[in-house]
Amino acid sequence: MVDLSSTAGSLKFALKRGALVTAANWQVVLVQFVADTLFKTLLAVPIVGGLVLVALVVGGNPFELLRLEPSQIISTMVGVLLAQPFALAAFLAALGLVLCGGSVLMFAVKAVSVTVLLAGDRIAGPIEQPPLRLSSLKQANQSNVERFITGVRSLFSRYLRLGIGLTVTYALLAGAYMALVFGPPATAALAGPLAVTLASLGLILAVTLVNFVYLLLQIVIAAEDCGVLEAVPHVARLLRRRLKSMGQVLAAILALMLMATGVSILATAALGLIAFVPFVGLAALPLQVFAWLVRGVVFQFVGLTGVATYVRLHRTLQASTVPVRSDGLQQVTRA
């Protein structure tokens, strides 16, 4: 029997355990990276098609549109498509189809990821305690085809309902953002760029918190084998009793994401300088592709490390509720 509370109070050990469990199940990292890349690639198809459609309507060259600033590209596409209702409907239908199909794929992949990480954390033992042995990593590796199928079969329908709720929440946030940016200002002091800046910061914060709660709901649904609504009180209890630890893990994961982004930007800039060197610049393209692959895998690894860490915190909270029998009655002792 593993002592789940031995390292519960240590952020360092919790993150270390999450990283080791994720590394042991490296197959899940690659699966999620491939699925995320496929989703983004499919999403680019209707967008590129929209650019070509706009270029054909205005009689220009699609490559000339790509040389514009992103804001100019978006404004040009919106202006042209609004003037062509049929083209706008076709573009929105294609974009919506890809979004729906890609989202369903990502829900299935996340069901696999959470199932594997739950099993890995359950059987890993005190893997975060030194010395680290290869046998411990092999024991924590729970990635196999049978578990993948089991995860999709048992969690997909619930994750799909949860994802629909997430989509509705995103739509409400987007509507509120558009109302704040394009609607009449509440006060004269909030007019102009200040309103856009505050609304953008508020949207980023709201999306981060929504994604955080969404991830916790996914974990609790899988760990407790319950429905979406039944998972809500479990998440509320987890946040109430482990708010500090959860906040520290979230801050650590976001910091790692920012560091990885900074390193990626520096690497891209350095490779961009190499591209101007004759002959040597030929090596820039494969290096850029390699850097992109490494960046994508690192991002998925960091994200899944957060999932594994939250799984651990949830299990320690569940283990802190110990049934005790006294005078023939069952009492519950909470940590």
Give residue ranges: language-model regions.
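Hydrophobic alpha-helical membrane segments
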Residues: M1-A335
